Amino acid sequence: MKDAKDLGVDMFLLDDGWFANKYPRKDDHAGLGDWEATKSKLPDGIPGLVRDAKKTGVKFGIWIEPEMVNPKSELFEKHPDWVIMQPKRDTYYYRNQLVLDISNPKVQDYVFGIVDRIMTENPDVAYFKWDCNSVITNIYSPYHKENQGNFYIDHVRGIYNVLTRIHKK
């Protein structure tokens, strides 16, 4: 961080690649959904980087994309039913990832929990870069079952619900 500060940097953004342990993020094929710092890359975790940034007078930001998941992740292994995916059909992957079904309140709680944990453990995080930029493919909500017509509306409402909870915190 000191070298960055010496160059005039006033904010450091930790981008994609900092997370997952069982399937560490090395490229876009694994790890998305497992939002814990990779121990081999960041032995002091996010708190260590935030402390270093604060000591040197650099603001710290972090990249997240908590509404997405790679099939090669612990989250997908535990909760394949949390993914927007048509049953008994070929799955289309956009950038080797799938969209979580944020119309599902359990998924909303999970996504909120990711941001809440980072903010709670690292109150000096100044900035979140939340991509939320994927198209929705494989359109089918396991949560809605027979009521698929409400999916898009409830998906957007789910995102708003998560953002409202974050804002209130």
Model-inferred region functions:
Residues Y23-R25, K72-L75, I139-S141:
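Short, solvent-exposed loop/turn and secondary-structure capping segments
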Residues T38-G57, E77-K169:
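Active-site neighborhood of glycoside hydrolase catalytic domains
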Residues M1-N21, E121-P123:
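Catalytic domains of carbohydrate-active enzymes, especially glycoside hydrolases
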Residues D10-L14, F60-I64, F128-W130:
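Hydrophobic faces of well-ordered beta-strands that scaffold small-molecule active sites
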Residues K2-D6, A20-D52:
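Catalytic cores of extracellular degradative/oxidative enzymes
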Residues K59-D81:
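Glycine/proline-rich, flexible active-site/cofactor-binding loop segments
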Residues W18-A20, I64-N70, C132-I136:
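Active-site-proximal loop/turn and secondary-structure-junction residues that shape catalytic pockets
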Residues A20-P24, D28-H29, V69-N70, P80-R89:
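Non-catalytic terminal segments and appended small domains
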